[in-house]
């Protein structure tokens, strides 16, 4: 083979190899592009799933909050109270820090309903709830227990200090300016307070506070008693 023929043969071979390399690079680039598209699609799906999960979790939290809230007063309801009481009771059993409970009942509430109607009664409940909630300490927990009755949980608070807190609530509620149908309506409450003691169950301390409440009622209402 002469030199010219050899050059031509080598040139053809190089062209063939170059073409093969170009086709390989093209296919490789196409594969990379396809993989990038698939990865992008997967990332979008994961992001959509995460967003949906967050929405569902937020909805569950909202539904739970609604289930734990009294619609009229916007305070925690009895179910929320039972959950929080169980938590604080377990904490008290472990650390033995002071823990007190108060049961609060609006005085002569039936008379308010009978005299002014249920709208007035509802408004009284809302006013009392708002007033007490605004004066809660950061660790306290208040709930509407039912009807005109509220319950207050006071962690890190002994009996006398708890009575002082509830007494301040009583004084402020008694000063609430409330008129219905152009007539002034007096709002007061009676309350019982008790502190957890050795051997107490959740029901035991609640029963003592409830008993103290009725002692306050029997003694003339608009006062706080302890047991």
PLM regions: where:
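Conserved nucleotide-binding and Mg2+-coordinating catalytic segments in signaling enzymes
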Residues: 65-83, 104-118, 126
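Signal-transducing coiled-coil linker helices
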Residues: 8-72, 78-91, 95-98, 140-143, ...
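Catalytic-core segments of nucleotide cyclases and related cyclic-nucleotide turnover enzymes
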Residues: 163, 181, 194-226
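Heptad-repeat coiled-coil signal-transmission/dimerization helices
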Residues: 81, 85-86, 102, 124-125, ...
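Catalytic core regions of nucleotide second-messenger enzymes
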Residues: 144, 173-189
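Alpha-helical scaffold within the catalytic cores of cyclic-nucleotide enzymes
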Residues: 129, 161-177
